[in-house]
Amino acid sequence: MANQLKTVLLLGVLTGLFLAIGHLVAGKQGMIIAFVVALFMNFFSYFFSDKVALAMYGAREIMYEEAPWLHEMVEDLAKRAGIPKPKIYLAPIAVPNAFATGRDPNHAAVAVTSGILQILDKDELRGVLAHELGHVKNRDILISSIAATIGGAISMLANMAYYTAFLGGNDRENNNPIASIIGSIILFIVAPLAATLIQMAISRSREFVADEAGAKISGCPLCLANALRRLEEIAHNPQIQEIASQEINPGTAHMMIVNPLSGDFIMKLFSTHPPTEERIRRLEELARKMQPGYGF
């Protein structure tokens, strides 16, 4: 519940930032234009991102005859989650990972890499798939699309401020054009940065929500915790990092269950995933709470 509230608050802050910058830069009319353009830009992303992401990794649908145990696992988890069974895809890449895509539970797909099928045991894989179904159940693709729409509109407004200042369109009631240009440059840099940081924070909060949802769907928080621990250890392997840099598109890293790309402290500010240690700690705490007799 706390992470759900955090998501709502962050979306509110992002919206407030957009309204404030829009009114400051272009007034009501310019603000509406920027929002509409950003909305159309993300319309394609919302409806077709699943096909783009799957094609990007050369993923193919896994038929029931190929892996009946995997289909039965996903079908059981989907029933427990109360959603339709999604299609299952295999991404032929060595980096162990998984992701979900699709705009709603009726148009969803889960993808596993060949690497993750080789690394995890069935209990751990079940935990991972439950996490991905948690994303589907919670409509996280829709939430990220809303955040991207507002963030995109903010970036467009910042660009408008930058070019308007240099073209002299901001001269009305302005006796200090130098200050206007400096202010526009600052806005051009800071506004998109602030919007991006908020979008990343929303993404991190959704990972916590999906972890909890997945743990409850599978009934085994420790299965997911063990999988995350193993995947995180592998992600720090220099050889795997080299493979990830070649196989993983940074633009889709946010979709993965763990961030396959390494980075320093600054990069972590822009990370779409919370620290894996914190995710594991929360799952272990949830496992204790789910034990019979807890709190009595």
UniProtKB/Swiss-Prot annotation:
Matches recorded under InterPro entries: HtpX_protease (IPR050083), Pept_M48_protease_HtpX (IPR022919), Peptidase_M48 (IPR001915)
Coiled-coil portions: none
Localization of this protein: Cell inner membrane
Group of enzyme by EC: hydrolase
Transmembrane intervals: 7-27, 29-49, 141-161, 178-198
Family from the record: Belongs to the peptidase M48B family.
Cofactors: Zn(2+)
Keywords carried by this UniProt record: Cell inner membrane, Cell membrane, Hydrolase, Membrane, Metal-binding, Metalloprotease, Protease, Transmembrane, Transmembrane helix, Zinc
Gene3D superfamilies given in the database record: Metalloproteases ('zincins'), catalytic domain
Positions contributing to Zn(2+) binding: 131, 135, 207
GO MF, any single term: metalloendopeptidase activity
Co-factor note (free text): Binds 1 zinc ion per subunit.
A GO cellular component entry from the record: plasma membrane
Topology in the lipid bilayer: Multi-pass membrane protein
Positions annotated as active site in the UniProt record: 132
GO terms (BP aspect): proteolysis
Protein name: Protease HtpX homolog
Lineage summary: Bacteria, Pseudomonadati, Aquificota, Aquificia, Aquificales
EC numbers, comma separated: 3.4.24.-
